[in-house]
Structures are given as C-alpha cells and as structure tokens.
UniProtKB/Swiss-Prot annotation:
This is 14-3-3 protein homolog 1. It comes from the Eukaryota. Coiled coil: none annotated. Gene3D superfamilies: 14-3-3 domain. It comes from Schistosoma mansoni. Belongs to the 14-3-3 family.
C-alpha cells in the first residue's frame, strides 16, 4: 500500500476527507479512499453510519486485492515444484504480498483498538467494529504460520465471539448481525476446518432470519436478503462437500 497524497496534504477538514473518500470510491482508488478515512478516524475518533461504511468499503477493497493476489501467487509457488527459479520468484513475491497484507490489517486493527471500539455506541456500531476486528485477524490468519497463526486465530475467535454476544440485542434480520454470522461461519470453515460448526452457525442465522422476515424494515431489506442468500449459498457449497480447490466462500 503506497503512501497516499491524502496523508501528506495539509489543511483538509473532516468534510473534505469524506468528500475525497467518496470521489476515490467512484474512481476505484481504494488506497486513497482508505487513507482519507484513516485520517478522518484519527481526527474524529468516532464514526457515523456513513463514515463507518466508507471506512469498511475502503479497507475491504484494499485488503481484498492483496488477499486475491496472495492466493494466485501462492498457487503458482505450489505448482513450481520442479522449477527452482520460478519457485524462488513466486516465494519472494508471496512474501512481499504478505508484508503488504500484514501492514494493512494491522493498520485497521490499530484504528479499531485506539479509536473505534472505545467509542462504539450503540449496539449495532459495537457489533460492526467487533466483527471488523474478527475479520482482519482472520485475514492475518490466512497467511500466518506456526505460533503467529495460533495467536491471530485466537484473537479472531475472541472478537467474533464478543460480537456475537453483543449482536443478541439486534434483530435476527439486522444486516450487521447476519453479516457477522456469515463471516464467523467462514472463519470456522476456512480457518478452523470445522465444517459442522460453520454449517450450524450459518443455518441457525438463516433460519432465525427467515422466521422474522415479515418484520424486516424496508431500508435494510435489500442488504439483509442479500446476506441471507450468501449464507444459503455457503451452506449449499459446504453441504455438498465437493468444493473445488481454490474456491472461496462468500463473506460480507
């Protein structure tokens, strides 16, 4: 992640930073978008719904590009078993991607720890940021090994567990609660290799939401039903037990 001009520009108000983030999103300049929202978060210490979503979208795209790149490079490294030169190049490139991914994830985790979680209120905001914390520790776990992996896996589990407890105060159809269940179930499937627990969690969230679908508010109907579809898609994928190597589960 290169140093963005946003971090170097002086005299930018919070309003300016939000405007820059929106422009950067439209231009698909997600590094600039993330830089703007990082600076906004550090200046304000608290985010409204709009700013919260801008931060989430920015970093999801920034880290998502590195996660995808890592998978491709790691796959190439595994295939180059009979070519030492190609394998070495792929290994060096993978390590570079891992460093970038670690830097981005730790940047987000620092924002959460220092600014966002201490100021999180009400319940939906607390769940949102705890889920985000679980997500970014999960992304670290995808590339970590040995003791480092054990540590970030536990931290991801702890954050998701705290988020799940806090989410009990939200309706079962709330998109943040559903998104948490979706990502937590992916954690069990991909990181813990516990397909039974993943399916149990996803099915419980889906069934509970279906039971209260008639109470779903119009403003969240689209988001909630989309996540419910992702839950169902993952359940179908996992239940079939025929996932091709390289397939990636849906998360929010």
């Amino acid at each position: 992640m290169t140093t963005s001009w946003v971090l170097q520009s002086k005299d930018l108000s919070n309003t300016d930073l939000v405007h820059i983030a929106k422009l950067a999103e439209q231009a698909e300049r997600y590094d600039d978008m993330a830089a703007a929202m990082k600076r906004y978060t550090e200046a304000s210490g608290n985010l409204g719904n709009e700013e919260r979503n801008l931060l989430s979208v920015a970093y999801k795209n920034v880290v998502g590009a590195r996660r995808s790149a890592w998978r491709v490079i790691h796959g190439s490294e595994m295939k180059a078993v009979n070519d030492r030169t190609k394998k070495q190049i792929a290994e060096e490139y993978r390590i570079k991607m891992e460093k970038e991914l670690n830097t981005i994830c730790n940047q987000v985790l620092a924002l959460l720890e220092d600014y966002l979680l201490p100021n999180a209120s009400p319940d939906d905001s607390k769940v949102f940021f705890l889920k985000m914390q679980g997500d970014y520790y999960r992304y670290l776990a995808e590339v970590a090994t040995d003791d480092a992996r054990t540590e970030v896996v536990q931290k991801s589990l702890d954050a998701y567990t705290k988020a799940t407890t806090a989410a009990e105060n939200l309706p079962t159809t709330h998109p943040i609660r559903l998104g948490l269940a979706l990502n937590f179930s992916v954690f069990f499937y991909e990181i813990q290799n516990d397909a039974a627990k993943a399916c149990e969690l996803a099915k419980s969230a889906f069934d509970s939401a279906i039971a209260e679908l008639d109470q779903l508010q119009d403003d969240s109907y689209k988001d909630s039903t989309l996540i419910m579809q992702l839950l169902r898609d993952n359940l179908t994928l996992w239940a079939s037990d025929q996932t091709a190597e390289g397939d990636v589960e849906n998360d929010s």
